[in-house]
Amino acid sequence: SIVRGTQLRETTEFLYNSGAKKVHVRPACPPLLFGCKYLNFSRSKSDYDLITRRIIKDREGENVSKEILFDYAKPDSKNYKEMVEEIRRIQNFSSLRFHRLDDLIESVGISPCKLCTYCWNGQE
């Protein structure tokens, strides 16, 4: 899973061991920065189960303000770009690009106020 940084790493190693020269990863959604507090669809029990939050913790420490977390959710911010690069490096991907939340919302065609985006941007 790209969410926790577990299974996909093993799959990547399998691909390289099977002769792949490069592994390019394109997840179907933006990076998850906040655990779902509404549906509990993830097996994650702590925000630190999320690879994004572990990277933020390594960079910023444990008591990170909401403002800093929100900056990591902005795909044009330096923090976001460096977080994605760190995920790519840790997972040994040749490249990693996430969908942008604004593009995802636009493609769904539903008013943003009717969509839950909490796990991506922390906005309730």
Question: Language model features by range: what are they?
Answer:
Residues 1-124:
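PRPP-associated nucleotide enzymes
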